[in-house]
């Protein structure tokens, strides 16, 4: 990733710390992956604190595929089958079947309804019957080990939520341009600045975790 583009957001470690602070303050974070991978930016928010207004922003400026990143333990708790048995997607993205809250929603597609679905899925006592299938929220199962195992936005979201002190569950959506194309780094940086979001790369997070885990050992 071009560090000159990112310099206004600080050093790699500062970017991670700023992202964690933003999440704790209830703000969103823009997460960029490598230019040689998907080369896109995802807006992420804690599943616990995301507001209807933030969900509306995400739907308005994103791909429309609003995803809830969860752990394997949560997937099992909710009894969510993986979307396909044989995942042939380019990056092995861990989609489960889609979900809708069983209660408290209308069509399920509005920002308010999607927040209701997210909250139902992450409740401590959530059970499979709390969710209908299919729905308008796309759960993503993260790999154990986070970004040190798989350098994806799903794992980055779980890692950031955990480091920030939240439940390991977060909402993400890819940023798109007004013309329908995917937003790349320059557009993601402009959007993050406009909407008071922190910005971090998956590469930053990998280095941060490696450094802190070396210290811990």
Curated annotation (Swiss-Prot):
The keyword Transferase does not apply. Its cofactor is Mg(2+); Mn(2+). Pathway: Cofactor biosynthesis; riboflavin biosynthesis; 2-hydroxy-3-oxobutyl phosphate from D-ribulose 5-phosphate: step 1/1. Binds 2 divalent metal cations per subunit. Magnesium or manganese. InterPro entries: DHBP_synth_RibB-like_a/b_dom (IPR017945), DHBP_synthase_RibB (IPR000422). It catalyses: D-ribulose 5-phosphate = (2S)-2-hydroxy-3-oxobutyl phosphate + formate + H(+). GO terms for cellular component: cytosol. Keywords: Lyase, Magnesium, Manganese, Metal-binding, Riboflavin biosynthesis. GO terms for molecular function: 3,4-dihydroxy-2-butanone-4-phosphate synthase activity; magnesium ion binding; manganese ion binding. Transmembrane segments: none annotated. Mg(2+) 1 binds at residue 38. Mg(2+) 2 binds at residues 38, 153. The record marks 136, 174 as: Essential for catalytic activity. D-ribulose 5-phosphate binds at residues 37-38, 42, 150-154, 174. One of its GO terms (biological process) is riboflavin biosynthetic process. It is an enzyme of class 4 (lyase). Its EC number is 4.1.99.12. HAMAP family: RibB (MF_00180). Homodimer. Belongs to the DHBP synthase family. Catalyzes the conversion of D-ribulose 5-phosphate to formate and 3,4-dihydroxy-2-butanone 4-phosphate. NCBIfam families: ribB. This is 3,4-dihydroxy-2-butanone 4-phosphate synthase. It comes from Escherichia coli (strain SMS-3-5 / SECEC).
